[in-house]
Amino acid sequence: MHNRMKTIDMAVAPKQPFEDNDTGLVVMLDGEIFNYEDVRRQLENYYSFTTRGMCEVITKAYDRWGDGCFDRFEGYFSIVIYNRWSEELLLCRDRFGIKPLYYATQRGNLFFASEIKALFAGGIRSLLSAERWASYLAYSTYGSPYETFWEGVHQLPAGFLLHYNGYSLVEKRWYEFEKRVSLWSEESPERLPEAFLEQMHRSVGYSLMGEMEKGLSLNGSLESALFISLMKEIGLPRSLKSYMHYRGKLHQSGVLWSAEMLAETPLPMEQVKITKSMLLKELDYLARWQEEPIDGLNTITYSAFFRVMHKRGLSVLSGGWGLNHFLGGVSLPGDSSTSLV
C-alpha cells in the first residue's frame, strides 16, 4: 500500500507504484521534486512521455543518468526503483533526510517503508534494542544515522542509496553536504554570498509552488525575517496568511517582533496560543504514533500547532525552519555544524 501527500502535480500524478514499460522500471515516491518539469525538458530529446507526472520523470532520469539522476533532483524525497529486467532494487533518501525511509531483512526478504509501524505490519518482529535504549536513557543520544530503537530495523541515512540484488545490500553515499560546501569555497569563494542568496531565492520560490492552500509559519527569529524579505522580492501570494504559535505570556514570545516584521506587508498574522492542556493531549497522540523518542518540548509544541492548522484546513506551512542553525545563530548541545559554518 502506498499513500503520498502531494502538494504539486496534483492533477497529473499517476497511481503508485508507477510502471514504465519503456525502461522496465517501477517507481514509488514519497515527497516532492520541485524541479521535475525542468528535468523533464532535459529528457524530452531522448524519450517520449506518456504522462505529465513526476514518477515518469524519475524513471526516465534514472534510465538516462543512473545514480547520478538524484543530484539533479531538487526537493525532499524517498524513492524506491525496481528494475524488472535486472531484478534489482534501489532505495534513495534525500540530501538531508527530510523524508524517512526504513528497511529490515528477515528470512531472506527485504522490507522497506516510510514508517517503522508499517514494517511491523508486514511481519517484522517488534523487538526493542536494549543497547540503543540504554544509550539514550544514559546519554540522551539517538545513535548513528543507521540505527533505530528497534532490533533489526535500520534507517537509510540522509543522502544515501541502497542497492539490493536479491542477495546483497550495498549502501552508497550520493550527497555529502560538507564536501559540496568545500567545493564551492575552493572554486569561487568570492561568489559564496551571492550563491547563498540564489539558493535561498530558489528555496523560497519552491515553498510557494503547488495548488494547495498554504500558510506562512513565523517564529520571530532571523530565519523568519529573511524568509519574509525574500518572499517580498519574489512576490507575496494574495491568499497567503501567516501564523505564529507561542507558549506562556504573549509579550515574552516572538509574536510582537513578528508583527513588526510584517508591518510593511499585506500579510495578516494570526496568533495561536499553545496551552498546557494542548501539550499534554498532544504528548498522548505522539506516544501512540511515534515509534521512537521525540527530541523535546518543541516537537510537542509544533505538533500541537500543526494539528490546529490542519483543523483549519491547512495542510502545508512554509517557513525558514533550521536556517538559524545553518547561519550559526543557535548552538545545540553536541552540534558540530557551528565549526563548519
Residue ranges and their predicted role:
Residues 298-304:
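Adenylate-forming
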Residues 37, 103, 227, 297, ...:
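Residues at secondary-structure transition points
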Residues 1-284, 288, 302:
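Cysteine-centered catalytic environments shared across enzyme families
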Residues 304-341:
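Active-site adenylate/phosphate-handling loop in enzymes that bind or generate adenylated species
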Residues 140, 292-298:
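Short, flexible loop segments at the rims of nucleotide/cofactor-binding pockets, characterized by
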Residues 267, 292, 314:
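Short glycine/serine/threonine/alanine-rich loop segments
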